[in-house]
Regions:
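Accessory beta-strand-rich segments of carbohydrate-active enzymes
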Residues: 54, 59, 64-202
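Catalytic cores of secreted or luminal carbohydrate-active enzymes
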Residues: 203-222
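Positively charged n-region of N-terminal signal peptides that target proteins for export
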Residues: 1-5
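Short glycine-rich loop/turn motifs that provide flexible caps or phosphate-binding loops at active sites
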Residues: 16, 48, 167
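Generic low-complexity segments that are intrinsically disordered, proline-rich and/or Lys/Arg-biased
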Residues: 8, 21, 46, 206-207
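Bacterial N-terminal signal peptides
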Residues: 7-15
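Solvent-exposed, flexible loop/coil segments flanking beta-strands in beta-rich domains
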Residues: 23-72, 82
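Bacterial Sec-dependent signal peptides at the C-terminal "C-region" and cleavage site
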Residues: 15-25
Length: 222
């Protein structure tokens, strides 16, 4: 059996997150989804047809990044998220939901989309004018990797961030293709609840974007 060794420092980096500064909470009002859209990487490779001889989706994970400037002093922030594929979310380079590994878990790829909502107040820089980075990585999962057929074409991410400011006002930031940057990259090559996760610890996660990132595209597959 082929084995690999991951340095302990890499493991420590992988598990450090906002917890206990972030926690899973009840979902926001479902009507807020209307202020967002599914987004994908524009040039992501696409496999279609039947999966033969154990063929996998192309290596690599879809990454999405947005920088948001505080419009006032932040009192609280709640982030409602979902993905087409196995996904993880980050705030300012730290995991905001690592307790929910391999999200969304066992779901029907053609019928069900589970959302995961987190209070991320403790992850944020809170001063007026300060900026926070929100990021998501979405691998193929069952959505576009092998089961029998490659169901979806591209991994996608959708989210709604609701920020409450100290003056009592609220602002909703939904995923929009023209406001988020996207690219294929990161250390995760594949992830699925049966096959587990393939992770290259030599690769630095692009929590804050990078030169390869371009404007995301809208995804209307689901």
């Amino acid at each position: 059996m082929k084995t690999s060794m991951i340095p302990m420092t890499a493991l420590l980096v992988a598990v450090v997150g906002c917890e206990p500064l972030s926690k899973r909470v009840d979902a926001l009002d479902s009507s807020l989804w209307a202020q967002s859209e599914w987004i994908s990487v524009a040039d992501a490779p696409v496999f279609t047809g039947q999966s033969k001889d154990g063929a996998r989706a192309a290596d690599g994970t879809s990454w999405f990044v947005r920088e948001i400037e505080n419009e006032g002093e932040v009192k609280s922030a709640v982030w409602m998220t979902t993905g087409l594929g196995v996904y993880e979310v980050y705030v300012n380079g730290k995991s905001a939901g690592s307790d929910d590994a391999l999200k969304p878990g066992f779901t029907h790829v053609k019928k069900t989309r589970r959302s995961f909502t987190y209070d991320v107040t403790g992850c944020l820089k809170k001063g007026k004018g300060e900026k926070n980075f929100f990021a998501a990585e979405v691998s193929a999962g069952w959505w576009r990797d092998k089961i029998v057929n490659f169901t979806g074409k591209k991994s996608a991410f959708r989210a709604v961030l609701q920020v409450t400011y100290a003056d009592g006002s609220t602002k909703v930031y939904g995923t929009k293709a023209d406001e988020w940057k996207a690219a294929i990259g990161g250390p995760v090559k594949h992830a699925a609840i049966f096959d587990g996760e393939e992770y290259d610890a030599r690769v630095v996660p692009p929590y804050f974007g990078g030169e390869a990132f371009r404007k995301a595209e809208r995804n209307d597959e689901f």
